[in-house]
Regions:
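ABC ATPase C-loop
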Residues: 152-153
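Topological signature of polytopic alpha-helical transporters
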Residues: 1-15, 19-22, 27, 36, ...
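Helix N-cap at the start of a conserved alpha-helix in ABC-type nucleotide-binding domains
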Residues: 171-173
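Conserved catalytic motifs of ABC-family nucleotide-binding domains
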Residues: 68, 81-91, 104-105
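Alpha-helical transmembrane segments and their short interhelical loops
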Residues: 178-180, 190-204, 212, 371, ...
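Catalytic Walker B motif of ABC-type/P-loop ATPase nucleotide-binding domains
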Residues: 160-164
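Hydrophobic alpha-helical transmembrane segments of multi-pass membrane transport proteins
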Residues: 372, 386-457
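Helix-to-loop junction immediately C-terminal to a conserved catalytic motif
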Residues: 49
Length: 621
């Protein structure tokens, strides 16, 4: 499809970032957008992709203004490669294809599409390698970049926008990437627009067209091969041994006088007959638009004569087709597909976190130590405090670990989600529900192992109380995770999140009912804000309700029992129920459990809405 942007002005915060920029990109060709840093290259790409609004000017594709549907048919490869690091390249591509290709495509079709792209982008060697990140070795920089491009190509986009695809790559990798893009554009008749920083001259001449921006103004648009000539004519000449790409950028940055010379030479050219008809001012264009296909391509500037009527016609048919298919369909796939695919991916990513070596070591070490410390605890008044300590500790470990893990994990996950949501892959609700589902099973595995071993090693109340304790602590873990997710969403940054989480945890712990059971009256209400308090109360209930009696403390000269039963009568044991009374656990079990559900739901729902409205991803920066 032919992309034409004319007289594009973009203003951000009252600052004119793009000033009357025009250009076009034709199917089968590569357009390079170059300019010094801060010139407005990314802004131009963002504007074409529809992520920054135009202040004035027009952007059309085959003569039609870009609609939302059409925008879904163009792809945008961001400068950073953002992925879930633990997934392999094939998993990543399969997920992308399944969530972005229409539901009616069969699995075989999707797989063959993915295979085709893996071939096209020469990624066969690393399909089973994990994506990796700074901590985990995975794909190399160049492979990752190609993976980013591959993720965009699965949908067979009509146009490909790339922001600095070669930065961070060595010369030969960069060269082969651009060469690959060039042959892809030619073979599949795609329009490719890419910003590029400091290309070598051989990379530079791979591009058919060049658009130069300087301080938001157009400094050149036309054939790449003619830019040096243009500079000559503008009275800015180049030594013969120079790399033209270095030369033009150097000149644009040299001083204001040279820059103005170039910009005004460009202005002159825009008013000359050399300037493409399609980029002329709007009055000229009105005649032109009546018959967009038959308009003579009267531009001498184009090196190859404009002979791609056929391709234009083909893509116009394509355009009609897309209009039919996706007119009122906001998402490429239905909710169910999105939910299923996101759940599967969520399962894979959280599996690698939860079953990681470190997690395993943590669980095993803590389980062993706790079992040894409290092994077969005698049921006596003297060890009452130990028993409570154990119950409190279980709550602390199983509540705060998921809380911390989530606070740390979410900001990284958010980057991927933001990228995908900006490109309109799926609904937020599908993602959020899928996240809850995929993590549910995994988050409960840890309590299951931990509690089962410890409960019987220590010798707590009994079988039915074991199951209830397990259930309570699973809810407790979920409540901790909900709070963590909420804090992660609110802070959006690991360090801020950790600080908030630490404050919350410390306060929650103090109010949790173990360190002090008699808070000052004016502070007492605050314990209700602590999910640890509810869990601890519920655990005490389960341990002492209907449990075996406790042996009274041995009376000595300096101490005696705290329980009246032991003091008054000759009884040597304390009924469990008296312990409950002593610690003011006076309400039925469910009154301690219900608030945990409230914690789970309120924090998750609040997190969803904050994600949806407050932290709306605005720009891909
Ligand atoms: N939200 C914003 N508010 C104010 N100024 C902005 C905003 N976004 C971008 N700018 C400014 O717009 C100009 C162009 O930014 P842009 O990111 O498009 O540059 P660039 O050409 O891509 O640079 P680089 O080569 O360094 O990536 C810069 O001067 C930048 O500071
Ligand atoms: Mg940029």
């Amino acid at each position: 499809m032919e992309l034409v942007f004319k007289h594009v002005n973009v203003e951000v915060d009252k600052k004119l970032i793009l000033n009357n920029v025009s250009g076009l990109a034709s199917p089968g060709e590569l357009l390079a957008v170059m300019g010094p840093s801060g010139a407005g290259k990314s802004t131009l790409l963002n504007t074409i992709a529809g992520r920054i609004p135009l202040s004035s000017g027009t952007i059309t594709v085959n003569g039609h203004s870009i609609t939302k549907d059409l925008r879904r048919k163009l792809c945008y490869v961001l400068q950073q490669d953002i992925f879930f690091s633990s997934l392999t390249l094939r998993e990543t591509l399969q997920f992308t294809a399944k969530i972005r290709l229409p539901d009616k495509m069969s699995n075989e079709q999707i797989t063959s599409k993915v295979d085709e792209i893996i071939q096209d982008l020469d990624l066969t060697r690393c399909v089973d390698t994990i994506m990796g990140d700074v901590w985990m070795r995975g794909l190399s920089g160049g492979e990752k970049k190609r993976a980013s491009i591959a993720c965009e190509l699965v949908t067979d986009p009509v146009m490909i926008l790339l922001d600095e695809p070669t930065s961070g790559l060595d010369y030969s990798t960069a060269f082969s990437l651009i060469e690959m893009l060039r042959s892809y554009a030619r073979d599949h008749n795609k329009t490719v627009v890419t910003t590029i920083h400091q290309p070598s001259s051989s990379i530079f001449y791979q591009f058919h067209k060049l658009l130069l921006i300087s301080d938001g103004e157009l400094a050149y648009f036309g054939d790449t091969g003619k830019v040096v000539d243009f500079f000559h004519k503008a009275d800015v000449s180049m030594d013969s041994h120079y790399n033209p790409a270095d030369f033009i950028l150097e000149k644009l940055k040299e001083d204001e006088k040279t820059r103005l010379k170039i910009v005004s030479a460009m202005d002159q050219m825009r008013n000359s007959s050399n300037w493409p008809v399609k980029l002329r001012s709007s009055e000229d264009l009105l005649d032109d638009e009546i018959q967009p296909e038959t308009a003579p391509p009267a531009d001498i500037m184009m090196e190859q004569p404009y002979n791609e009527k056929d391709s234009v016609r083909v893509s116009l048919i394509e355009l009609d087709k897309t209009d039919d298919n996706t007119q009122d369909q906001k998402w490429p796939t239905g909710f169910i597909t999105q939910y299923t695919q996101l759940t599967l991916r969520g399962f894979k990513t959280s599996k690698s976190q939860i079953f990681s070596k470190f997690k395993l070591i943590e669980t095993v070490t803590l389980t062993i130590i706790v079992s040894l410390i409290w092994f077969q605890l005698p049921r006596t008044e003297e060890t009452l405090r130990d028993r409570m300590g154990l119950l409190f500790y279980m709550g602390m470990h199983l509540g705060f670990t998921p809380l911390f893990d989530t606070v740390i994990a979410f900001p990284l996950e958010r980057m991927v989600i933001t990228k995908e949501r900006l490109a309109g892959w799926y609904r937020l609700s599908a993602y959020y529900l899928a996240k809850m589902t995929s993590e549910l099973v995994l988050i409960l595995i840890q309590p299951l192992i931990f509690i089962t071993i410890i409960y019987w090693c220590v010798g707590l109340n009994g079988v039915s109380s074991y199951y209830a304790t397990l259930g309570t602590l699973c809810l407790h873990s979920l409540a901790g995770q909900s709070v963590g997710l909420f804090l992660g969403i609110v802070s959006m940054d690991i360090r801020k999140g950790m600080t908030q989480a630490t404050i919350y945890i410390m306060v929650t712990m103090l109010l949790g009912g173990f360190y002090t059971r008699s808070l000052p009256v004016w502070l007492d209400w605050m314990k209700h804000l602590s999910f640890q308090w509810y869990t601890f109360s519920a655990l005490l209930y389960l341990e002492f309700y209907d449990g075996p009696d406790l042996r009274c403390a041995v009376r000595t000269a300096v101490s005696e029992s705290q329980f009246s039963t032991c003091l008054d009568s000759n009884s040597t044991s304390i009924p469990s129920s008296e312990v409950l009374q002593f610690y003011s656990i006076n309400y039925p079990y469910w009154t301690y459990i219900l608030p945990l559900f409230a914690f789970i739901f309120i924090f998750r729902i609040a997190g969803y809405f904050i994600l949806k409205f407050k932290q709306k991803p605005n720009q891909a920066k």
